[in-house]
């Protein structure tokens, strides 16, 4: 028989047995769960090393996966080059939040039209023309010397390879960003002066203001597109600050005294812009040059501004449109310099009906690269 003390301790024994049994069960479950989890990690690791890797036994080199950033280059202690974003960097930097439609709608350029643009030069005829022309060339030479820019001979495309004059992607972006930051000044300053003149004299401006503001807006869109592709250095930003402050005030004062000289100066400035972008297009046509530009996507802001561009368009397609814009600015400003500044209308703004003579327009179908002569226009 079981003693009375055994009956008294029976609940304790049952509880102890239950705890031990539960612990054993938990241990088995724990062992099962641990074994399953370990096996799962092993299979995941194997799958990860197999995908996109020719050798499944070697781990993935995550550094080779493109991350948002810039294209690696040789950094010097005193680095003043513009860094070019890689494909992922352009997509990450392509902020389209609150992106509004362009205020000034861009003209539809045909493919044949953008390829017809070529380098031209209007020979200076008057003293003002010579001052404007040689002044432009002087500033161009100074800028070329500072930035290490040179155009090789047509028969020697690799003439400057390996020297400080060789144009890399970083140097091209530095040049484009600086030039566009300055090119947006004349149109806005001239439009502002003419706006004040219209208010002060209580008279119409005859459509000059709209075209000048459109020009400034267009140049700023060039700049906004380029800064989505390249990240300017502190040196470039500093030069832009100084250059804008000096150039804006000088241009403003000269435009008050003689606007004709200013428009001729801008016409020659745009000639140099067309020359620069033509050089860039020639290098893009060479498969051995600028390899990083060959595979770059264009920013979304460019697709929305130029109606003929798509997300599949190349960097060369973008530069062709920008060069065409500069060619049109060249034509407009040389034409403006040929007109009576405060009396004649803007011939680009309105097409005269019932006329069989060629007339200026904002497109590329009828152009005069050296400007329209006043005697050939309906004013």
Curated annotation (Swiss-Prot):
Composition bias, kind Low complexity: at what positions?
A: 33-50
Provide the transmembrane region boundaries: 234-256
The biological processes this protein is annotated with in GO are: alternative respiration
Main subcellular location: mitochondrion
Identify the InterPro entries for this entry.
Answer: AOX, AOX_sf
Q: Which GO terms describe its molecular function?
A: alternative oxidase activity; metal ion binding
List the cofactors.
Fe cation
Membrane topology category:
Single-pass membrane protein
User: Looking at the UniProt record for this protein, which Gene Ontology cellular component terms does it annotate, in alphabetical order?
Assistant: mitochondrial inner membrane
Binding site residues for Fe cation 2: 219, 270, 326, 329
Top-level taxon in the UniProt lineage: Eukaryota
Looking at the keywords, is Oxidoreductase present?
A: yes
Localization in the cell? Mitochondrion inner membrane
Alphabetically sorted, this entry's keywords are: Electron transport, Iron, Membrane, Metal-binding, Mitochondrion, Mitochondrion inner membrane, Oxidoreductase, Respiratory chain, Transit peptide, Transmembrane, Transmembrane helix, Transport
Enzyme Commission designation: 1.-.-.-
Enumerate the residues binding Fe cation: 180, 219, 222, 271, 326, 329
Q: Where is this region: Disordered?
A: 33-76
Record's cofactor remark: Binds 2 iron ions per subunit.
Q: Where is Fe cation 1 bound in this sequence?
A: 180, 219, 222, 326
Q: What does this protein do?
A: Catalyzes cyanide-resistant oxygen consumption. May increase respiration when the cytochrome respiratory pathway is restricted, or in response to low temperatures.
Q: Which protein family is named in the record?
A: Belongs to the alternative oxidase family.
* Name under which the protein is recorded: Alternative oxidase 1, mitochondrial
Organism per entry:
Candida albicans (Yeast)
Q: Which gene encodes it?
A: AOX1
């Amino acid at each position: 028989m079981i003693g009375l003390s055994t009956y008294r301790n029976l609940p304790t024994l049952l509880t102890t047995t239950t705890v031990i049994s539960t612990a054993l069960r938990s241990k088995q479950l724990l062992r099962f769960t641990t074994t399953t989890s370990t096996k799962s990690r092993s299979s995941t690791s194997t799958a990860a090393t197999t995908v996109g890797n020719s050798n499944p036994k070697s781990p993935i080199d995550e550094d080779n996966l493109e991350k948002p950033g810039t294209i690696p280059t040789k950094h010097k202690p005193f680095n003043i080059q513009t860094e070019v974003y890689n494909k992922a960097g352009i997509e990450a930097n392509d902020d389209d939040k609150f992106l509004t439609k362009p205020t000034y709608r861009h003209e539809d350029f045909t493919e044949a039209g953008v390829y017809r643009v070529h380098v031209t030069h209007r020979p200076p005829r008057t003293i003002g023309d010579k001052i404007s022309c040689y002044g432009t060339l002087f500033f161009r030479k100074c800028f070329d010397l500072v930035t290490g820019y040179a155009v090789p001979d047509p028969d020697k495309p690799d003439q400057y390879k390996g020297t400080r004059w060789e144009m890399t992607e970083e140097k091209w972006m530095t040049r484009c960003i600086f030039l566009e930051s300055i090119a947006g000044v004349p149109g806005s300053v001239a439009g502002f002066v003419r706006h004040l003149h219209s208010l002060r004299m209580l008279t119409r401006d005859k459509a000059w203001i709209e075209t000048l503001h459109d020009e400034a807006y267009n140049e700023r869109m060039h700049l906004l597109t380029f800064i989505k592709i390249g990240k300017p250095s502190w040196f470039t930003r500093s030069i832009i600050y100084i250059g804008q402050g000096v150039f804006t005030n000088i241009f403003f004062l000269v435009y008050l005294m003689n606007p004709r000289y200013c428009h001729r100066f801008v016409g020659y400035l745009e000639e140099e812009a067309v020359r620069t972008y033509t050089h860039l297009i020639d290098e893009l046509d060479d498969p051995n040059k600028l390899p990083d530009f060959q595979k770059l996507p264009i920013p979304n802001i460019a697709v929305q501004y130029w109606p003929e561009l798509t997300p599949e368009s190349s960097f060369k397609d973008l530069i062709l449109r920008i060069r065409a814009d500069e060619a049109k600015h060249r034509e407009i400003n040389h034409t403006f310099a040929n007109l009576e500044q405060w009396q004649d209308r803007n011939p680009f703004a309105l097409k005269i009906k019932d006329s069989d003579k060629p007339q200026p327009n904002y497109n590329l179908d009828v152009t005069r690269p050296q400007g329209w002569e006043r005697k050939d226009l309906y004013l």
